[in-house]
Amino acid sequence: MPGRFELKPTLEKVWHAPDNFRFMDPLPPMHRRGIIIAAIVLVVGFLLPSDDTPNAPVVTREAQLDIQSQSQPPTEEQLRAQLVTPQNDPDQVAPVAPEPIQEGQPEEQPQTTQTQPFQPDSGIDNQWRSYRVEPGKTMAQLFRDHGLPATDVYAMAQVEGAGKPLSNLQNGQMVKIRQNASGVVTGLTIDTGNNQQVLFTRQPDGSFIRAR
């Protein structure tokens, strides 16, 4: 048939067409023909018609029944059930009425405590302690031995006066030191014999004076 013989030369030309493509010279003939076939398949795939109809949403039977039940008007039995008044619940507790406030009741008066006046402890404040002078001891050493500040002795030495009783201590002399509750030296007496004593007292400014 003439049509068959005309188609065969055309197919042969198409089959050998890749041999004339210079940019495919590095590839073997079979690879060239494979590339041409793949290109033809892609073109045919693009040209085929596609199904553009959107997928219709699937409505379940339950959704249809819900829509139908909502669209129907309520029956008389449903309306009667809504109009029935609820019965009292026995579990509900009735509100408790507040107790009335009785007038005339005396208010509770707070208890008052009597505060006692401050009484200073005379047994601790201004307490005198007696010390006997040992051989070779000075007044400053006597203070140090009993944990008292020697600076008080130096302050009293500035007003020592006649006879210098602080500097001329004798063995066996009796010395009395007075301290307040805080342990501060507030007075000092030295027995000078013949029932006579020398007295030093502290002033409010911290200095000492010889009282007698």
From Swiss-Prot:
Residues 99-120 have a biased composition (Low complexity). Keywords: Cell cycle, Cell division, Cell inner membrane, Cell membrane, Membrane, Transmembrane, Transmembrane helix. The keyword Transport does not apply. GO terms for biological process: FtsZ-dependent cytokinesis. The chain crosses the membrane at residues 34-50. Pfam families: LysM_OapA, OapA_N. GO terms for cellular component: plasma membrane. The keyword Repressor does not apply. It is a single-pass membrane protein. Signal peptide: none annotated. Residues 88-127 are annotated as: Disordered. Belongs to the OapA family. This is Cell division protein YtfB. It comes from Escherichia coli (strain K12). The gene is ytfB.
